[in-house]
Amino acid sequence: MKQQIQLRRREVDETADLPAELPPLLRRLYASRGVRSAHELERSVKGMLPWQQLSGVEKAVEILYNAFREGTRIIVVGDFDADGATSTALSVLAMRSLGCSNIDYLVPNRFEDGYGLSPEVVDQAHARGAQLIVTVDNGISSHAGVEHARSLSIPVIVTDHHLPGDTLPAAEAIINPNLRDCNFPSKSLAGVGVAFYLMLALRTFLRDQGWFDERGIAIPNLAELLDLVALGTVADVVPLDANNRILTWQGMSRIRAGKCRPGIKALLEVANRDPQKLAASDLGFALGPRLNAAGRLDDMSVGVALLLCDNIGEARVLANELDALNQTRKEIEQGMQIEALTLCEKLERSRDTLPGGLAMYHPEWHQGVVGILASRIKERFHRPVIAFAPAGDGTLKGSGRSIQGLHMRDALERLDTLYPGMMLKFGGHAMAAGLSLEEDKFELFQQRFGELVTEWLDPSLLQGEVVSDGPLSPAEMTMEVAQLLRDAGPWGQMFPEPLFDGHFRLLQQRLVGERHLKVMVEPVGGGPLLDGIAFNVDTALWPDNGVREVQLAYKLDINEFRGNRSLQIIIDNIWPI
């Protein structure tokens, strides 16, 4: 059942018109990631796309302006992931700074309320005195919730980035770059990015109406909230296109300079990350999971409270609570992975090979962790995966992750068309989606999903591969180049961190921490001795003292320990030669 991993080198677009002063290595890396001109490398706020191109913004800011003037009770309804938490906190903080005092927030509980603006969540908002609801990172599929709000005379502004269905909810205003009639050039804004753009537009409208002058309020600097935008954008794994790179870089720069929310500072502390050396990967792999742990296992209100609090002492208490939840999440996930691999073995034995698309269910799985499980199994077997857990009412909740070549939401939409009623509801993106179905429909869904993936996907796309930026010359294997690469980001989804490959002599190898392989290597053609580490190796294969030469796929990195800096390579894949 071991997945064979192939190595492929990226193609470089030789027609890219990049600045001549860029180092040749960076020109190569940028050109192979679709960057075609200098303006796509802009990282200052002046390079941001203008909010005026987002459809629905003018209507939304007019509604909000009138709500501000009349003292209307505004309830922000968020989502229970990191994007939803940052969107919620940003919207509340921004509107407070803009002069709104009658504002509160509500985050649906994953286990009691489910996703989005449901009628039940509307009732909760109504009980809190809502006179206007603003959704963030949800709402585009909340037809019933919006209708229920209308029946209670509560207008709704929907801000979302998820893909819309054929019909839209009957909200007073909808802001979503993925609307069919929206001309916003970037379709990759996270929910927190959409919320930030709405707040920029609202600030401009309020200024033009004389709002700040009338009340003697200083016009707020909304750039102070870009730390939240960066965290939500990276944690939600949206593509880091040119506009998202600006938002992320600006937010990271504020965090590095110590100009961030106390909650983010506290998360960095519990994750043992130095703010001054922050990388985008720290947001995705250290802060994001801790924030997400609240929504996965408990209640995301803890995460939002952390991001909203102004006191570092209070923030540290909440961050430690999230850190403990994340540790529990890891333990739950580890057990679920073992069970999932057992299910894969059974599937393979019964069918001679794994299906092209995997739908998996275990009655003891935790619905807050199935998304991570789907990601892990997808990475291991390189095929679309949907993992289900019981919702406790005779239904299952599933979370899916896809690979390049299969649009997950489109696949679910096709299944819904072919087999009406098989799913209760679904939604999502190209690479991730969520759905629910009745428990007795699981086996049918498992079969139909596998068949659809087999029909839609070329078998070659199910072959695991590592995509490399090619070799580094010995002269490029230096601390200076490693620092250059670190500073050339932010790297992330659809703009991956540089990965190189090469042929090396394996001089030393030993296990550290049970499953990590520590090595010393030297380029076969001559070059510097390099320390390297490969994480979570197959200990049945490594170390192998009979192997003298290896092909490596690796990242050039700087190891910082007790004030000392040294060059090292992080090995993604190792092949004996």
Regions found by a protein language model. Give the residues of each.
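Hydrophobic helix-and-loop "lid/oligomerization" segment in the mid-to-C-terminal part
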Residues: 2, 8-131, 152-153, 204-441, ...
